[in-house]
């Protein structure tokens, strides 16, 4: 039951961080393109790549901490559902080009961010 508490607490923290970053991005860059969702998914992919690498190659993270960070914090921080909804809205109401760009940018950049997170974690671990 303790593990559930920490995962839930992590999820709440991730959700609040997502809301804060998304709001900031919308205020800074405008609402014409879902910059906030893109930012949280890229950052989350990087961090989840790093967390996964650290968990897989060291004993620095207990199983509860690993789940709290990955399932909790990163699960609350990243958002496929918002990406999906915003992409559909772009295509439906505004622009096929913007919607397809959102798909391509999100897939490629998030994948690269995840790999970069793993590489950075490996280098940090190696010292």
Swiss-Prot record:
This is Fluoride-specific ion channel FluC. Its main location: membrane. Na(+) binds at residues 75, 78. Pfam families: CRCB. It is found in: Cell inner membrane. The keyword Ribonucleoprotein does not apply. Keywords: Cell inner membrane, Cell membrane, Ion channel, Ion transport, Membrane, Metal-binding, Sodium, Transmembrane, Transmembrane helix, Transport. It comes from the Bacteria. It catalyses: fluoride(in) = fluoride(out). HAMAP family: FluC (MF_00454). Signal peptide: none annotated. Na(+) is not transported, but it plays an essential structural role and its presence is essential for fluoride channel function. Fluoride-specific ion channel. Important for reducing fluoride concentration in the cell, thus reducing its toxicity. Belongs to the fluoride channel Fluc/FEX (TC 1.A.43) family. GO terms for cellular component: plasma membrane. GO terms for molecular function: fluoride channel activity; metal ion binding. The gene is fluC. It comes from Sorangium cellulosum (strain So ce56) (Polyangium cellulosum (strain So ce56)). InterPro entries: FluC. GO terms for biological process: cellular detoxification of fluoride. The chain crosses the membrane at residues 4-24, 36-56, 100-120. The keyword Plastid does not apply. It is a multi-pass membrane protein.
């Amino acid at each position: 039951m303790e593990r559930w508490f920490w995962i839930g607490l992590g999820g709440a923290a991730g959700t609040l961080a997502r809301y804060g970053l998304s709001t900031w991005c919308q205020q800074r860059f405008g609402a014409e393109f879902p910059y906030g969702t893109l930012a949280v998914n890229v950052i989350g992919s990087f961090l989840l790549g790093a967390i996964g690498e650290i968990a897989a190659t060291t004993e620095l993270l207990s199983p509860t901490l690993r789940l709290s960070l990955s399932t909790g914090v990163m699960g609350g921080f990243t958002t496929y559902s918002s990406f999906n909804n915003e992409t559909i809205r772009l295509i439906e109401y505004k622009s096929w080009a913007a919607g397809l760009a959102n798909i391509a940018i999100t897939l490629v950049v998030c994948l690269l961010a995840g790999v970069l997170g793993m590489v950075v974690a490996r280098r940090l671990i190696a010292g």
